[in-house]
């Protein structure tokens, strides 16, 4: 998730137990610089034959009027219930 000025953006995606994921078994990658933070979800590695396809689903939600998080206990009170 990402929090900014009272808004919380949450991105959900599945982890498939026993699947082969890239980058040492990770199902996400992050990138950050002074302007942005990116979280990219990754699906498992698969071998596709001609005419085959695969899919990867993300579910996004945006929550508003979230109080500023000042302590770890605030996460439990305001954020966990939204996950």
What are these regions (language model features)?
Residues 1-55, 65, 69-77:
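A contiguous, surface-exposed recognition patch within enzymatic or periplasmic domains that forms
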Residues 59-61:
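Short, surface-exposed secondary-structure boundary micro-motifs
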Residues 77-83:
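Short, cationic low-complexity segments
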């Amino acid at each position: 998730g990402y929090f900014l000025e009272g808004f919380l953006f949450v991105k959900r995606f599945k982890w498939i137990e026993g699947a082969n994921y890239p980058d040492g078994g990770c199902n996400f990658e992050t990138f950050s610089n002074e302007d942005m933070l990116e979280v990219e979800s990754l699906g498992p590695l698969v071998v596709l034959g001609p005419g085959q396809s695969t899919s990867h689903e993300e579910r996004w939600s945006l929550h508003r009027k979230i109080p500023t998080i000042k302590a770890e206990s605030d996460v439990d009170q305001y954020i966990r219930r939204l996950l």
